[in-house]
Amino acid sequence: MSEYGKAGSGGLQSSQYDNIDRRERQKQLVLEHVDVSKDPYIISNHIGSFECRLCLTVHNNVGNYLAHTQGKKHQTHLARRAAKEQRENPSVSKNNYIQTTRVIHKKTIKIGRPGYKIIKQRDSKTGQLSLLFQIDYPEIESGLQPRHRIMSAFEQRVEQPNKDYQYLLFAAEPYETIAFKIPNKEIDRTTGPDGKFFTHWDRNKTFTLQLYFKE
């Protein structure tokens, strides 16, 4: 697991359509990678909203719920729940987690980790820290696009949880999923021409993701 180390122009109408399309692609990537049906804390109520059983909060849609799961309140409750379960059942180890992931991916023969490059920058105007990830997937399966997900330190079972960090995961068959350890700070998810969150999948089979942390 590694620690971390706007382009274009055009008419207003074209820019607006590009902005909408990009937001939809980002939303779809998240929904494809995160199976909320396996989340023990989400329930749908009688008015079509979604509730978090862990934090007793209500959310208008799945996207809002997923954003909530990355927040401080949910992460704090997860940490407390994990500590309680560890005390009550100390025999559960990370080996169980590893076995589970192997079963999930047993139909695909992994070919190793993809190559990658990370660029660390700061916005000259706002002072915000930026991380740019470029992941190469030359042998990605036909018709697929890479997926990404941000995971809290208390969801993973590879390292001892540290509340100061979170993990950015990239996945694409038949490559192994790779994870980067990044600061546990709120990510600026503004989009659009001046947005601070950007993803791109190009014809050279390089997946690019750039994010900024809020100050």
UniProtKB/Swiss-Prot annotation:
GO MF term list: nucleic acid binding; zinc ion binding
Domain of life: Eukaryota
Biological processes annotated in GO: mRNA splicing, via spliceosome; spliceosomal complex assembly; U2-type prespliceosome assembly
UniProt key word Protein biosynthesis: no
One Pfam assignment: zf-met
Compartments reported by the entry: Nucleus
Entry keyword set: Metal-binding, mRNA processing, mRNA splicing, Nucleus, Spliceosome, Zinc, Zinc-finger
Broad class of where this protein is predominantly found: nucleus
Zinc finger (Matrin-type): 50-80
Entry function: Involved in pre-mRNA splicing as a component of the splicing factor SF3A complex that contributes to the assembly of the 17S U2 snRNP, and the subsequent assembly of the pre-spliceosome 'E' complex and the pre-catalytic spliceosome 'A' complex. Involved in pre-mRNA splicing as a component of pre-catalytic spliceosome 'B' complexes, including the Bact complex.
Family note: Belongs to the SF3A2 family.
Quaternary state and interactors: Component of splicing factor SF3A which associates with the splicing factor SF3B and a 12S RNA unit to form the mature 17S U2 small nuclear ribonucleoprotein complex (17S U2 snRNP). Identified in the spliceosome 'E' complex, a precursor of the spliceosome 'A' complex. Identified in the spliceosome 'A' and 'B' complexes. Identified in the spliceosome 'C' complex.
Protein name per UniProt: Splicing factor 3A subunit 2
